[in-house]
Amino acid sequence: MEVKEINIAHIAQVCIENVFRTSTAKPGYVHLNFGKNLSSTEFRSIMVDLKNELSKFTTKQFNSTLAYHWLVRFDQQVNTPFHLDNAEDQSFLMLGYEPSEVDSELYLADYVKYANDSKVESTECIEKITPIFKEDESLLAPYVTKVSSFNSDTYRIVFINNSKPKSFPEMLGVFHKVLIVTPDVTKSRIVNSMILNLLPKGMINKNEPSEEAFLNTDIISK
């Protein structure tokens, strides 16, 4: 989705409709392209505003806030397998990509649909294949989506359902996988990464990362 006007409430609604899923009829992710006319600080501020808007929704819908499990900026030029990031069973991943000369591709795989179509009972299959898919990736091929128009010269957010359901109907996640097409250690590929857990209202995460530090830091992890 190309974002022509930064309306956080509208963007959040798109995320809610596509990512907060309890069936495989929805994709479980959304790709937002903000173009080139932003600064890194402005971009990170959009990410934080979007997270906070989505937290209003989860508070009303699930009586749970979205709490930071992980909040960091890093320079990533490493291929990954299909996987879920380490987090609570009901969680979300917000990846904010800054413009880069390093070409990359992002793939999503609906592991829940794969599990439903397998000959093994769904919850048993999910337990076996998560958090990292270690089997032949060709088995996932019918369930894989390559994120289109993943232009490396623009600011982009990909918001992903990172959940691992223990029972149904909990929210259903999707795997993600990155492929670095042209690695180049002389250049940077900066990813702003948020992992968000559903935290029951009233509970406090004493180890929650600092939102202010994320917005103002110049530190890039390797």
Map each language-model feature to its residues.
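Short, solvent-exposed loop/turn segments at secondary-structure junctions
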Residues: 36-39, 99-101, 163-166
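Short, surface-exposed, charged loop/turn segments at secondary-structure junctions
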Residues: 108-119, 171-180
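N-terminal auxiliary "cap/dimerization" subdomain that precedes the catalytic jelly-roll/cupin core
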Residues: 1-61, 216-222
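Catalytic core of Fe(II)/2-oxoglutarate
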Residues: 135-222
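Short, cationic low-complexity segments
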Residues: 113-135, 216-222
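Conserved double-stranded beta-helix
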Residues: 52-114, 128-132, 139-144, 198
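Short, well-ordered loop/turn elements at secondary-structure boundaries
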Residues: 25-28, 76, 87-90, 151-155
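A structural signal for short, well-ordered beta-strand segments and their strand-loop junctions
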Residues: 30-33, 93-95, 105-107, 157-161
